[in-house]
């Protein structure tokens, strides 16, 4: 018999009327902001499918803005996301895209720019019941849910990099639940995503960056 989570039946604790359009949207944005050094100065949201049609009426816009500011799905400040973003000096925009149809119906692209001028673009899908999937980072197709502690390594696709990552984690006693490599092409930019059911110890990022073929390390913990 298939296991059914309580979230599949009732959905998560959340602010807003829909687990797909509010809680899921908030979680996508919350995960996205973990991938860039704060503070953010701008966030631009492109919405697809049903997100594009109902984003204002269902509170998807407030949920996305709250998530990008680091609010959890049950944080009552989400109701005042617009005012809080203005107070913080965070510029934002929402652009519905109803022409691209070959895409999951609850999809959003989030373009973030921080105070240092660094830009990152993340695509996420809201699957229902507060479950989400991150499917693209800076144009590279990836796949992770944010349900585990995630280590995201941005690297050049060179021999020995994955072995370096595995050794560092093994030496620090990290139990790997999932480990996958995503790349643009041979020798180009690649992402290794490691998911673990334990929190990642301090200092892991610095040790990984000792490899000259590793450009960046992001830790996304729920």
How should each PLM-predicted stretch be described?
Residues 24-28, 60, 161:
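Catalytic-loop motifs flanking and including active-site residues across diverse enzymes
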Residues 30-41, 46, 130-131:
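An N-terminal amphipathic alpha-helical segment
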